[in-house]
Swiss-Prot record:
Its EC number is 3.4.21.88. Represses a number of genes involved in the response to DNA damage (SOS response), including recA and lexA. In the presence of single-stranded DNA, RecA interacts with LexA causing an autocatalytic cleavage which disrupts the DNA-binding part of LexA, leading to derepression of the SOS regulon and eventually DNA repair. One of its GO terms (biological process) is negative regulation of DNA-templated transcription. It holds the Pfam family Peptidase_S24. Keywords: Autocatalytic cleavage, DNA damage, DNA repair, DNA replication, DNA-binding, Hydrolase, Repressor, SOS response, Transcription, Transcription regulation. The gene is lexA. The active site is at S118 (for autocatalytic cleavage activity), K155 (for autocatalytic cleavage activity). PANTHER family: LEXA REPRESSOR (PTHR33516), LEXA REPRESSOR-RELATED (PTHR33516:SF2). Residues 28-48 bind DNA. This is LexA repressor.
């Protein structure tokens, strides 16, 4: 949408998250400290670049003089995730939904547009927006966003003890259980389902 570099995207996501959690944007010094920049000047350069690209507006003379543009407010809606790419890569973000992330518990970091009917019996249908809390800490029986190799899927997580095998269960008898052996397959949990929105 804004053709951001990975570092600019990182700064933008920090500004959004910080603003959502505290009600006001971070200072340059806070951005530098959180992201490990050597100085506030480094943060300032990224902020200026974001403003040039239209992702934020700068209000001169204020230490917290950063405002997200209208299209940046709300929770990002992620469409199809290209193989191997981070879920919140800028090219995956279709839009933003103006619902406070605190509407969900735990809070939602993004919406993932659902493709397919493998989770229909859990009330998650094709085209729905799945509210996702970013975490890799999940419990048996929870609905998760998982990455297997380069593909992302939404399934119910099941694991016996500390075994290397994981099962990802669909909520539709027409689909098969996915068996993952973490000893020879790349596997990670990208987030936890915390709600679903259906748009007419």
């Amino acid at each position: 949408m804004y053709n951001l570099t990975s570092r600019q995207e990182q700064v933008l996501q920090l500004i959004k998250q910080y603003t959502e959690e505290t009600g006001y944007p971070p200072t340059r010094a806070e951005i530098a400290r959180i992201l490990g920049f050597k100085s506030a000047n480094a943060a300032e350069e990224h902020i200026k670049a974001l403003a040039r690209k239209g992702a934020i507006e700068i209000m001169p003379g204020a230490s917290r003089g950063i405002r997200l543009t209208e299209s940046q407010s709300g929770i990002p809606i992620v469409g199809r995730v290209a193989a191997g790419n981070p879920i919140l890569a800028q090219e995956h973000i279709e839009d933003y939904c103006n619902i406070p992330n605190s509407f969900f518990s735990p809070s939602a970091d993004y919406f993932l547009r659902v493709h397919g009917m493998s989770m229909k019996d859990a009330g998650i249908l094709d085209g729905d927006l799945l509210a996702v809390h970013r975490t890799d800490q999940v419990r048996n029986g929870q609905i998760v966003v998982a990455r297997i190799g380069e593909e992302v899927t939404v399934k119910r997580f099941k694991r016996q003890g500390n075994q290397a095998q994981v099962e990802l269960w669909p909520e539709n008898p027409d689909f098969k259980v996915i068996h993952v052996d973490m000893r020879d397959q790349e596997f990670s949990i990208e987030g936890l389902s915390v709600g679903v929105i259906r748009r007419d």
